[in-house]
Regions:
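Glycine-rich phosphate-binding loops of nucleotide-dependent enzymes
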Residues: 2-248
Length: 248
């Protein structure tokens, strides 16, 4: 089976800083893959290049065999790539349902937010997505009144609007309390399941990584330090030294 995502010799520099150093990686359909590494290791740079927010200096990014390395985020989304952000990208003055309705309408500016949010069909779809995450009772609450963990889930719900084949999540449990992190991740996995999307998630919490990832890719100074099943990677001596500090 061909990989849903294939990256070859991907390079990205910011001045003297090497953010991606000959990255080569295949991601099969249906896997849950966690990207780990210290701050600045290259994880978010990788996600930004795959989703079109950053152009690589060289190398190729193939989605189902289509070169997407120079496409815009909107174009990448049309082909089946979607993402959430470490800091949720929401309109705080709108309700949860209105934010999702804006995403459903494809309008990304503030100039005409209310009209699409009032369309019944879009609202029904918005509430359906919120129900997946157990958040339907918050549909009419303004984002400004919602806790950080709930905002994360709504941001991820927005990423599911297009039913992507590849979903990239940037630290889905950051800012979520220790008591809520497993519940949050359970909701994410459950909610993505109907679309059968491949999930790539950046994560610093090794408990989350070991519980939810089928495969772990460890980054260090723009390179892939280790790649394999969680137990193998998290016990790798170089990973323990440079990434986890011995923490599992």
């Amino acid at each position: 089976m061909n990989p849903v995502l294939s990256v070859r010799q991907l390079e990205k520099r910011f001045g003297a800083v090497v953010a991606a150093d000959a990255l080569t990686l295949d991601i099969p359909a249906g896997q849950k893959i966690s990207l780990i590494g210290a701050n600045g290791a290259g994880k978010t740079t990788f996600v930004n290049m795959v989703t079109g927010y950053l152009k690589p200096d060289s190398g190729t990014i193939l989605l189902d065999g289509i070169d997407i390395g120079k496409r815009s985020p909107r174009s990448a989304a049309r082909l089946g790539i979607s993402r959430s952000f470490q800091i949720p990208q929401l309109f705080v003055e709108l309700t949860a349902a209105e934010n999702l309705a804006v995403a459903i309408s494809g309008i990304g500016t503030r100039m005409s937010l209310r009209a699409p949010a009032e369309a019944q069909g879009r609202r029904d779809k918005a509430v359906e997505l919120l129900e997946r995450f157990g958040l339907a009772d918050l549909a009419d609450r303004p984002i400004s009144e919602l806790a950080g963990g709930v905002r994360k889930l709504i941001d991820i719900a927005m990423a599911l609007v297009r039913r992507p084949k590849l979903l990239l999540l940037d630290e889905p449990t950051s800012g979520v309390s220790a008591e809520e992190k497993f519940t949050t991740m359970d909701r994410v996995i459950h909610s993505v399941a109907p679309d059968a999307a491949t999930i790539v998630f950046v994560e610093h919490d090794m408990e989350i990584v070991s519980r939810y990832a089928d495969r772990v890719v460890a980054f260090y100074q723009g390179r892939i330090l280790a790649d394999g099943v969680p137990a193998e990677v998290l016990n790798n001596q170089e990973v323990r030294r440079y990434v986890t500090g011995g923490v599992r």
